[in-house]
Swiss-Prot record:
The lineage of its organism: Bacteria, Pseudomonadati, Pseudomonadota, Gammaproteobacteria, Pasteurellales. InterPro entries: YaaA (IPR005583). It comes from Haemophilus influenzae (strain PittEE). HAMAP family: UPF0246. Belongs to the UPF0246 family. It comes from the Bacteria. It holds the Pfam family H2O2_YaaD. Signal peptide: none annotated. GO terms for biological process: response to hydroperoxide. This is UPF0246 protein CGSHiEE_07045. PANTHER family: PEROXIDE STRESS RESISTANCE PROTEIN YAAA, PEROXIDE STRESS RESPONSE PROTEIN YAAA. One of its GO terms (cellular component) is cytosol.
Amino acid sequence: MLAIISPAKTLDFESAVKNFPVSQPHFTDYSEQLIEVCRKLSPQDLSSLMSISDKLAGLNAARFAEWTKIHNENNSRPALFAFKGDVYTGLDADSLSEDDVIFAQSHLRMLSGLYGLLKPLDLMQPYRLEMGTKLANPKGKDLYAFWGNVITQAVQQAIDAQGDNVLVNLASDEYYKSVKESQINAKIIKPVFLDNKNGKYKVISFYAKKARGLMCRYIIQHHLTEIEQLKEFDLGGYWFDSASSTETEFVFKRDINE
């Protein structure tokens, strides 16, 4: 079983990280090409392109300038511990055991606009480059054109290494679009998280993001290998609703106490 998740805009390169045997990101040749494109953009260009403040644009221009193909523990940190958005709040990597992190290294991948696909212990440098960014590059008008089949093939290789042909899609639509589903040879399960608010079950973005992280944590902590085991997920008060689910879309519901 392989789970895929999105990265996060919020990063943590300050707090202490446990000592794990780190790995190198696989697609730095591609990353370097994107960095070269980004370095040609002014902070004003970045602000417009990414719809971010001047302050954030300046920070990211500096990050692009400082980025280097050489990744070590002085300029990088493992991706699993660098991302700190809503999904990663649910995942709570800092509290995972060493065995859990080792399991995650084989069973979890993070999609990335800059790095393509990251293993949890792959080193990464601070950056902001969302997959949906319309960054013109030598291969096309955006990052989907740039990555082409590269991410899809890497995901398939990771699935093949599991031997059970199961992909759990916990990524956002923006990032999952970089995976060409028609080319994936696996049973793809998409968990959907619905919260009951004012008498109606619906997707509430903040809660859904955190729930995707919780599901990721559940897979990692229980070392899941079977599809049916996903239905036992109960973290955060969610429960599997078989009546609303299909063979490939697993619906989990929760009642919010106001």
